[in-house]
Amino acid sequence: MLELALNNGVHRQSGRQLGPRTGDPGSFSNLTEIEDAFEQQFEAMYRPAMAFKNADMYLFATQMPCPLICSFYGSCLERGDDFFNFGIEPYAGHVTGICGLPNIADSLAAIQKVIFTDKAADMAELSQALATNFEGRKELLQKLRDAPKFGNDLDEVDLIARRVLLRSSQFVCKHHTWNDRKCAIGCIGMTVNIPYGEILGAMPDGRLAGEPLSEGGISPYPGRNVSGITAVLNSVAKIDHDWLENGSILNVRIAAGACSTLDKLKKLAALVRVFCKKKGSLIQFNFVGTETLLDAQKHPERYKDLLVRVATYSSYFVELSTALQDNIISRTA
């Protein structure tokens, strides 16, 4: 949606007019105007997506009941009704998954810092740089990459993430499904950050065209959280998780030695407890070093039993695609 907001509704790679015309990006003079354009793009894309999802859910409820799923919900058993029909309250299984929130926050923070505050370039120059994947604009690219980033306990970017998510959530939660059930929202990108990134152009946060978006759902973009795990958890906790009714996914990879003693394990447990007290949601760890993962890529026959946490599920590392392996390796704390 941010790409559409910064390109007057046009998808960069295809050149198609996918969203409404929300204004020449060169005319934006402050962050509020960009966020308003983003919201318009989000709302325009949500309506047809919701219509499709309603049709999908209606078919499930009337033609393809799911007794196995129903067996896990007491209300379905009590009512004798399907999960996708009227079996559960107050939701009917429809969730809007948000992917790339940290990229959005990083991008808006970079625009605020580099364009509006430092005036290192104007919006027209930024728009042209994005269109050409920063060809010939390496200095501007570096300045955008040096701007504040999500995951470092910095209010100037963390509160942008909170604000964008709040506005999107408030819009989604006004809607209802075909059987009058409330819609839910969650930062649960799973592993779609890789294919989604492939169809997107460059972004103001310094991500180049075709590169993956931030993974998991709410995890900082790889390599940008440079202030330690406590800063990561503080950034994530600033987001109002009460609006994330379907939760969020935070992936963290730390060295195995971080839990090599009982004292270290207790410290990690205390860290997680504080995160939960701050109303953080799902956090999952990989306790494996970079050297081990890189060696597993080179010699998969030696690591057939190497399990890693992907996104709410675990898998054998050597069975994952190279792109997903690289994404897991790039995770940091």
Segments (PLM) and residue ranges:
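Structured mid-domain segments that build the active-site/substrate or prosthetic-cofactor binding neighborhood
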Residues: 1-141, 214-333
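Internal maturation/activation junctions in enzymes
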Residues: 53-60, 81-86, 118-214
